[in-house]
Amino acid sequence: ESEEEQMRQCRSRIEQLNGKGYFDWCMLDANPHMGGHFVWSYNDYARGSQDETMYSGVVDINRYPKFSYFMLQSMRDKAVSQPGLYEGPMVFIASYNASGDFASSTTDITVFSNCDEVRLYRNEKLIGTQTREERTPLFRSIVEKGGSPMFVFNAGEYETGTLKAEALVDGKIVATHSVSTPGKADRLVVDIKTDGIIPVADGSDMIPVYFKVCDKNGSLVYNS
């Protein structure tokens, strides 16, 4: 899926969590006794009834995380962590930072975080700072239930280079994420997702191994 398609899914899901429309997950917003919700389609899958792929998962058909994976991760309390899987505070830039193909890489840059404040930089220049408090009115139902708002920055004119997000709690940087504009394909990078598991060659463990096409700096070349 392209950046724009992934962002469309993120916006749809966060609107559902915020209590808008028919797909309000069993009246989650309206019912104070509803403890939470789960996503049925964790991964993209091949439909049995038709020859097509359903792109409704938060990971792709190979279990590689999509943007919405990190959107849902931002709903986790920053005090909660599980060694080997995730640490409490998180921040993620939902962009490939590539103007040529995606209009959403140029102006509105979305950042997911479960922290109090987010700063976004382009090539070391501050684009803006947003706080959880400032964003709450747009996502009140989510925040009141312990979730997090989306942080959306108007980045203005596009520049190749690096986007960097900093997440802050009590004025201190607790998490960062950077995305650099990809260059030409240069190498294959092997990414082994152990998720804290020490694999044993006894036939019981299955560990996904991904081969990513990257440029000379290690940035993912998303369209290769």
Spans of model-derived segments:
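Generic structural detector for well-ordered beta-strands
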Residues: V152-G156, S178-S180, D191
